[in-house]
Each structure stands twice: as C-alpha cells, then as structure tokens.
C-alpha cells in the first residue's frame, strides 16, 4: 500500500474511534444530566414542602389574624394566672380585715365579760354584808337572810357564766389568730415567678423571630441556588447538540479524506463552518434547531 | 413600714421596704378615711406581693374606680414589673 493511502486509512480509523467516543460521551452526559435534573427537581419540591411546613408551624406558634397561636395561649394563661393571684390576694386581704374586725369585737366582748365578773363579785360582797346584817337583827332578819342567799347564788351563777364566756372568747380569739395567719399566707403570693416567666416568654419569642428570619433567608437562598442549578442543567440539550455537531463535522472530515472528495471540498467546507450552537457560556445564546 | 400624711383633701401613704400583708391593719384603718385623693408613695419600696395589689385595689374601690384619685408615685424595679404585668398601669395613675 502507498504511503498517502496508509495515512488516509489510519486517519479514517482514528476519526471513526473519536466519533464513537464522542457518541459515548454524549450518551453518558445525557444520562448524568438527566439524573441531576431529576434530583434537583425533587430537591426543589421537597424544599417547597419543607418551607410550607415550616411556615405552617410558625403560624401555629405565632398565630394569625384569626388565631392567637401558641404564644398567644401562653400569654393568656400567664395573664389569667396573674389575674387569679391578684383576685385571691384581694379576697384574702378582705378576709384578713374582717378577721381583724372580729378579733376587735371579741376583745370588746371579753372586756364586757370582765366587767360582768366584777359586778358579780361586788354583788357577792353585798349579799354577804346583807346576810351579816340580817343575822345581827335576829328573827326579824330571817327573810332578808334568804334574799341575801338568793342574791349570792345569782351572783355566783353570773360569775360562772361570765368566766365560761371569757374562756370561749379566748378559744375563739386564738382560732381567729390562726385564721389570720393562714389567710396572710394565701394573701401574700410571690409574683416574681410570673414576672420571670413573662420575661422568658418575651426572650423566647424574640429568639424565635430571629431564628425564623434566618431560616426563611436560608430557605430562599437554597431555593434560588436550586433554581439556578436547574436552569444550568437545561443547557444539557445544547451540549448534546454541540457534541453531535462535532461528531458530524468529524464525519465530514472522514468523507473529505476519502478518494474523489476533492470536488466536494467547497460544500464540505461550508458544512464544517456552520455552527449549530453559538453559546460560549450559560448566558444568552442561540441554538439552531434541527 | 408605713407613714401617713393626711391633709383632708389628700392622704399620702409612704411605704418603706416590703409592701406586703404586714401593713393590712394600717390599710384597714386608712380605708375609713374619705379624702379627695390618695397618693401611695412607693419610691422606697423594693418588693410587692399579691396582698399589696389587693390593698391597692381596695383603695381604688374606695374611690369607685376613679384612676385619677389614686396615684402611685416613685414606682420602680420589682414593684413596677409586677404592677405592669398585673395591668395596674391601666387602672391607676402610675408616676
């Protein structure tokens, strides 16, 4: 075989191999791009679902126009708790004041009882004197002696009754003092815990708001990146066409190398220089549609 | 501790330290008076409990809820936090 013939045969074989490789590359690229496109499309859908769920959760926590949300419920519970504590405090103060009034009345009654006991004691003394006088005047004083004894007996009974009342009042007074102590405990609820809880709630809401803003920002950025990736993957067609065009042009070169093609060189040259894709980047460009 | 200044038209109640159930008897006596205005000075008070709020509400009842007739002065620190949380700033004139 002559030398130009050997070279032509070698070039033809090499070109056939390159064209075959390009075909494989195109097929692999198409497959990889297709998978990437599927993955990013699913990612975009999941991101949308995730964002929707997140926004619903945020609404559940923060509330909407028609719903107070978890934060509103917590504030309401705390407010009701404080209202109840104030109500209990007010009622307890009223009870304590009533108990104090009762204790005052009890003391006054006890003083009156002591006065009655004093009167009974004086009456006893008077009846004793009357009895002595009745004794002194002999038989004529017998009737007075009986009256004096009756008065003494009444004074004793009155004194006993007063002592019993005084003792009962002492028991009542002690009981009122215990009531007052118990109600004082009820009246004096410490509201510091509620104040601290309220502050913590405010801090948590502020943190939650900051985290929400940051999360929504991240969501938006990831969504934008995904959209950008999806847009870039749509250039797969252009790349496939470009690879196909390279294969076609190599076929033209193969044809040009064959014997008798010298007359068709002008036509082949025109086909070689025709660009199906004018794009040099992922920006704006044109694709010649077949 | 409680100190009272009464000039008939205005009764000023000055409290010191803790404003709690221990001054209920003093308040009970005060509630028998009928001044035009009550001034409760809390500038030297560093703690209030629920009974203090109850006593203030009883003072308010005494003037039939007229917020202008019960003035709370010198409210600061814990007493202010508690009073604001219990919404007393809407029921009283807080200074």
Where in this protein do the model-derived segments appear?
Chain B
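Short, conserved structural micro-motifs that define repeat-unit consensus positions
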Residues: 11-25
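Short beta-strand/loop segment at the start of cytosolic alpha/beta domains
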Residues: 1-14
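Amphipathic alpha-helical interaction surfaces in cytosolic regulatory modules
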Residues: 21-91
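Short acidic-hydrophobic, aromatic-tinged amphipathic segments that line or gate anion-handling sites
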Residues: 93-95
């Amino acid at each position: 075989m002559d030398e130009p013939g050997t070279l032509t045969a070698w070039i033809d074989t090499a070109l056939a191999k390159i064209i075959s490789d390009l075909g494989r590359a195109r097929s692999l690229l198409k497959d990889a791009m297709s998978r990437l496109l599927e993955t990013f499309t699913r990612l975009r859908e999941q991101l949308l679902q995730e964002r929707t769920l997140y926004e619903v959760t945020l609404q559940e926590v923060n509330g909407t126009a028609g719903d107070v949300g978890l934060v509103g419920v917590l504030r309401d519970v705390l407010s009701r708790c404080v209202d109840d504590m104030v109500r209990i405090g007010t009622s307890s103060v009223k009870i304590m004041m009533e108990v104090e009034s009762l204790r005052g009345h009890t003391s006054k009654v006890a003083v009156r009882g002591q006065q009655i006991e004093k009167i009974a004691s004086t009456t006893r003394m008077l009846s004793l004197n009357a009895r002595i006088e009745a004794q002194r005047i002999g038989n004529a004083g017998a009737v007075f002696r009986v009256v004096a004894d009756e008065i003494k007996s009444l004074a004793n009974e009155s004194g006993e009754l007063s002592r019993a009342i005084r003792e009962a009042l002492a028991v009542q007074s002690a009981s009122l003092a215990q009531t007052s102590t118990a109600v004082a405990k009820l009246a004096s609820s410490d509201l510091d815990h509620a104040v601290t809880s309220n502050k913590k709630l405010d801090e948590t809401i502020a943190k939650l708001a900051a985290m929400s803003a940051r999360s929504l920002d991240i969501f938006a950025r990831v969504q934008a990146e995904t959209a950008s990736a999806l847009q870039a993957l749509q250039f797969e067609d252009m790349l496939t066409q470009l690879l196909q065009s390279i294969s076609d042009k190599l076929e033209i070169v193969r044809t040009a190398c064959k014997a008798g093609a010298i007359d068709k060189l002008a036509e082949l040259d025109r086909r070689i220089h025709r660009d199906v894709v004018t794009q040099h980047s992922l920006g704006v460009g044109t694709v010649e549609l077949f | 501790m409680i100190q009272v200044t009464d000039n008939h038209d205005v009764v000023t109640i000055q409290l010191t330290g803790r404003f709690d159930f221990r001054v209920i008897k003093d308040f009970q006596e005060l509630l028998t008076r009928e001044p035009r205005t009550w001034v409760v000075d809390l500038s030297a008070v560093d703690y209030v409990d629920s009974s203090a709020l109850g006593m203030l509400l009883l003072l308010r009842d005494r003037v039939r809820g007229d917020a202008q007739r019960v003035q709370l002065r010198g409210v600061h620190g814990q007493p202010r936090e508690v009073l604001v949380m219990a919404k007393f700033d809407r029921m009283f004139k807080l200074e």
